[in-house]
Amino acid sequence: ILCLILAGKVGSNIASEIGTMRVTEQIDALEIMGVNSANLLILPKIAAMVSFIPVLVVFSMASGITGGFLIAQFTDIISVSKYIYGLQSFFNEYYIWQAIFKALFFAFVISSVASYYGYKVKGGALEVGQASTDSVVVSSVIVLLLDVVLTQILF
């Protein structure tokens, strides 16, 4: 779920940023100066996403466990002892590593699809918005399909 949210927010930002640079001919200026524009613009975004999304996944797991504990503490839905017993008895370290591994793939897909759609924009502001929307839709579908495939492979 976290990666789908990030596909919408971060993916659209990447696509619109690179798309705006393409429309305003900043990428063309970089290429005229002899700079590899794809290497300069796309690689840092992919590296940042691949290194930071697994951290966000671990943080979201910790937040979920803490939220569950607080619900158990302040409501009568489940007792705190049953909640802690459930965490201890059903904990499997493999699930955490699996989530981190899947997050690496999702981060690469989100950033590379958004960068591709932003990099290939031709036209004006309307096309930048369309490329941003297309990148969100395509990366969300790929993340969902990749989640199914990776789950089948890892289990």
Which residues does each predicted region cover?
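Hydrophobic alpha-helical transmembrane segments of multi-pass membrane transport proteins
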Residues: I1-D28, L56, V113
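Short cytoplasmic-facing helical segments at TM-TM junctions of multi-pass membrane proteins
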Residues: I18-I42, V128
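Selective transmembrane-helix segments that form parts of the transport pathway or gating/packing helices
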Residues: L41-A62, V136, S140
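Membrane-interfacial helix-loop-helix connectors in multipass membrane proteins
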Residues: A62-L104, S112-A131, I153-F155
